[in-house]
Amino acid sequence: NNRLTVAYNPDAPTPKKWLQFLSELLQPEDIPTLQEFLGYCLLPTTKGQKMLMLIGKGGEGKSRIGLVIRSLLGDSMNTTSIQKVESNRFSRADLENKLLMVDDDMDMSALPKTNYIKSIVTSECKMDMERKGVQSYQSQLYVRFLCFGNGALTALHDKSDGFFRRQIVLTTKDRPAGRVDDPFLVDKLLREKEGIFLWCLDGLHRLIGNNYQFSISGKARENMETVKRSSNNVIEFLQSEGYIRFKADSEASSKALYEAYQRWCEDNAQKPMSANRLSSELAQNERLYNVEATNNVHVGGKRVRGFMGIEVVNPLPY
C-alpha cells in the first residue's frame, strides 16, 4: 500500500519557490521531462519504461529534488545505490512495494552487469527476491530509479541499445560562481508541498495523455547519443573519416574492417573492443548505415564474411 504523505488540496497555490529552483537548475525545455517523471513516480506502474539521470558537475543542488520527493512519497521511497541494486542479491527485496529509489551520489564506475536494472525498469514479470534467512520468493517490482551524479551510467560489457534506451539523461546548468547557497532551501520548498504535488500530478496527466511517452528535449536526446558514443567507441569509429567509406557498390571483409578499427583505436588512444562487437554493431544497424552482412566477400580467391556497402580506405595488404 503506497499511501502518499501529502494532502490533495486542489486550491494549493502555485509552488513559486520550487519553480524558481528548477529554473536555476535545468534548461526550460527539460523541466517538463522532470515533471512527468516525478508524476510517473506517484503511480505503481512501470509503463514508462525509463529511469532518470540528473547529471551535473557538483554543487548545483540537484539532490534537493530527492529530499522534496521524499516528503511526498514517505516510506514509498528508498535511497540506495544503483550499483548495489545490480550486485547485491538482497538489495532488490528492499525495493518491493516502493514507488521510487533515489541514488543521490551515483558511483561513476561502469556496471559489470545490467540484467537486474534493465528488468526492474521495464518490470514486465516477477523476479526472485531474497531476504536474509528467508526462503526466496517471486514478486513484481514497480519501483522507478532517479539518479543524481557527475556523469552518466555506463556498463562494462552491455553496449546494447536496450541499456541506453531505458535512460533519460538531463544535464543541469552550471552553478553560478558567486551564488550563496540557502541552507534553509529545502524547508522553504517543503512549505509548498501541496502545490508541488499538484505540479507533479499535471506531469502525470500529460504523461498518461501521451501514452507514457516522455517529453524529451533535443538536448536530452543529444546527451543520450553522447553517452552512447563515449561508452561504445565502435559507433565513433563508424562515424569517423579516413578509415572507412560507405558506398553502395563496395564491400569489405570483417577482418579488413577490424584492422581499420584497430588503426583508428591506436590513432585515437582508444581501447579496441572485440571483432565480434564491431561486426554485431554493423549487423544490428544495417539500415542506419545502408550495409548488408554477407558471407560472400571475395578476398584472394576465397569467400569470407564481411559487409556490402562499406569499404576500407587504404587497407593493409593481404
List each language-model region with its residue ranges.
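Feature primarily recognizes SF3-like P-loop helicase cores of small DNA viruses
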Residues: 1-318
